[in-house]
């Protein structure tokens, strides 16, 4: 058969039930984030596990994240790094950055994570060329194309690019005009599919995850 069974909600539930989930600390972090009115748009636990495996296979030591939110993904990714690994996470929203920094400080990987507060469009250019083994984008979708350009510069050969929300919050195939973020994702997906210097694929996990390798 040329066609495979489409991924359904049942598949997603099945996958999640057979993937390492959150520990007590991460569950507590999420509960506190909800009480602080931080939107529940962090990555899924099964997506976190998948990304951790990718980082371990890559032997990543330096990671850059754009979009800290509550710090959930930063902590997960940092846990996949060696003891001397380093993750720099960038967050524009001051309230979210403050919340994330407080919880990261309490985590078991506090010494591996640096929270940079401000606009990624200004912070990314200050980072050194070929200084990262992986870059994760999970911020404003209208900025993805610009962040991808910076990721190309930052990544070492064979470095990983990972980009969240390729399925546009479940609205990728919705008919008619959509809100700005959905249209931005649709546009970025076309850019990413043809981006020079990257070999990439969308993985149907979470809200869709772009995974690519920086080509020499």
Feature names for model-found ranges:
Residues 1-134, 141-162, 166-216:
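A short alpha-helical cap/connector motif
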């Amino acid at each position: 058969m040329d066609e495979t069974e489409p991924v359904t909600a049942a598949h997603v539930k099945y996958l999640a039930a057979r993937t390492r989930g959150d520990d007590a600390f991460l569950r507590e972090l999420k509960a506190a984030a909800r009480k602080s009115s931080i939107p529940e748009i962090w990555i899924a636990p099964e997506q976190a596990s998948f990304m951790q495996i990718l980082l371990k296979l890559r032997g990543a030591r330096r990671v850059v994240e754009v979009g800290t939110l509550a710090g959930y993904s930063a902590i997960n990714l940092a846990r996949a790094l060696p003891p001397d690994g380093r993750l720099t996470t960038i967050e524009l929203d001051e309230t979210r950055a403050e919340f994330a920094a407080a919880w990261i400080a309490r985590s078991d990987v506090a010494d591996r994570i640096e929270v940079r507060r401000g606009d990624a469009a200004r912070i990314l250019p200050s980072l050194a060329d070929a200084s990262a083994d992986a870059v994760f984008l999970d911020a404003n979708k209208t900025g993805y194309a610009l962040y991808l350009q910076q990721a190309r510069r930052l990544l070492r050969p064979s470095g990983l690019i990972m980009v969240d929300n390729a399925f546009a919050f479940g609205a990728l195939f919705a008919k008619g005009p959509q809100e700005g973020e959905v249209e931005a994702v649709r546009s970025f997906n076309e850019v990413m599919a043809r981006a020079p210097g990257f070999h990439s694929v969308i993985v149907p996990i979470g809200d869709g995850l772009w995974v690519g390798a920086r080509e020499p």
